Regions:
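N-terminal Rossmann NAD(P)H-binding glycine-rich loop of SDR-like oxidoreductase domains
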Residues: 3-23
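Amphipathic terminal alpha-helices
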Residues: 11, 23, 27, 305-330
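C-terminal "lid/loop" region of Rossmann-like NAD(P)-dependent oxidoreductases
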Residues: 31, 207-208, 212, 241-242, ...
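NAD(P)-dependent short-chain dehydrogenase/reductase
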Residues: 40, 129-135, 157-218, 222-233, ...
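Conserved C-terminal active-site "lid" loop/helix of NAD(P)H-dependent oxidoreductases
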Residues: 44, 222, 241, 275-300, ...
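NAD(P)H-binding glycine-rich loop region in Rossmannoid oxidoreductase-like domains
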Residues: 53-96
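Catalytic helix-loop patch of NAD(P)-dependent Rossmann-fold dehydrogenases
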Residues: 88-103, 110, 116, 124-172, ...
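Non-catalytic, hydrophobic alpha-helical segments
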Residues: 225, 229, 244, 255, ...
């Protein structure tokens, strides 16, 4: 049996590959990557998986990879996933996330394949939700507040349409905030952890730059997310959509306080709002209702968010030390 992970070099993709290799060794793991994709997230498993160069915006390259792999399951995780970047590059974000997803579905149709497909959308599709709609359910209206969110609405609806029009066995998720070691430095809790590690190493002044600390998020650990994605294709019927989220709900400021409690330099670090980190249109309240998914799969988050934060901080401490010669401020 073969699983194909698009975006395997990324944060969740690499963790998912590790989990499948460890817990489901009967599965053969294939992954797509761009030719320029960094591969450090795969350093411990690269010899145990098969990588394929592939550009989601190039239909012919997807047809080539799918024809070679003939996957039984596809975890479609590849995306331009940074909200702030989407404001700077909206066309590229739409091209990668919407057109890339449609190309994947078209390649499957062209080849007449019938894999189970996980199409990974985002809680960002819901945008700024009214207080009376918290916690957010799957039937909450879309109010996308960024080009990234618009692209994920497009991906989500493409998954819906390709299932109902063509019978592709697509199951959609709208994933809420998730974190852990290897999380990209542009994302809020990972950015904070990286800054703390740099301050501890003496290569950043003791000023921690932040955006909006009042926004509310519900955090999940990447290891719990990977379990959820596997259970999704094990237990859930094609055509359905599920919110998936953790249970650690707090403001960004409360999350920062938890992180600062993990460093001996807490009292020396100044927190400073950086206007460059503020979104043009913020989404301030993201609390999921994951009841539908939990009922279908029996899934529950297992990793405390304090451990998630500690994992991120230790990751950045190791990374900063290993790259200290290039990390120093000019």
């Amino acid at each position: 049996m073969r699983a194909l992970i698009t975006g395997i070099t990324g944060f969740v993709g690499s963790h998912l590959a590790e989990m499948i290799l460890r817990d489901h060794p009967e599965w053969e793991i294939h992954g797509t990557k761009r030719w320029r994709s960094p591969r450090q997230n795969l350093v411990d498993i690269e010899e145990s998986i098969t990588l394929h160069d592939c550009d989601l915006t190039d239909l012919s390259s997807l047809i080539r990879v799918l024809d070679e792999v003939k996957p039984d399951r596809i975890f479609h995780l590849a995306a331009q996933s940074y909200v702030m970047m989407s404001y700077r590059a909206p066309t590229a974000t739409i091209d990668t996330n919407v057109n890339g997803t449609i190309n994947l579905f078209e390649a499957i149709r062209t080849l007449g394949q019938d894999p189970l497909i996980h199409a990974c959308s985002s809680s960002e599709v819901y945008g700024q939700v009214r207080d009376e709609d918290i916690p957010i359910k799957e039937d909450t209206p879309f109010r996308p507040a960024s080009p990234y969110a618009v692209s994920k609405v497009g991906e989500d609806m493409a998954g819906y349409m390709y299932h109902h029009a063509y019978g592709l066995r697509i199951i959609r998720t709208r994933m809420f905030t998730h974190s852990g070691a290897r999380r990209g430095e542009v994302f809020v809790d990972s950015s904070f952890a990286r800054q703390v590690a740099r301050i501890e190493a003496g290569i950043q002044e003791p000023v921690l730059r932040v955006g909006n600390l009042d926004s509310v998020r519900t955090f999940a650990d990447v290891k719990d997310v990977c379990r959820a994605y596997w259970l999704l294709l094990e237990k859930c019927p094609p055509g359905e959509v599920y919110n998936i989220g953790g249970e650690a709900t707090m403001t960004i400021g409360e999350m920062l306080d938890m992180l600062l409690d993990m460093t001996d330099l807490k009292d020396q670090i100044q927190v400073k709002v950086d206007p460059a980190l503020l979104r043009p249109a913020d989404v301030t309240n993201q609390v999921p209702a994951s009841d539908k998914f939990k009922a279908a799969t029996g899934w529950r988050p297992a990793v405390p968010y304090s451990q998630t934060l500690r994992d991120m901080l230790e990751y950045w401490r190791s990374n900063v030390v290993a790259n200290s010669t290039t990390e120093r401020d000019q």
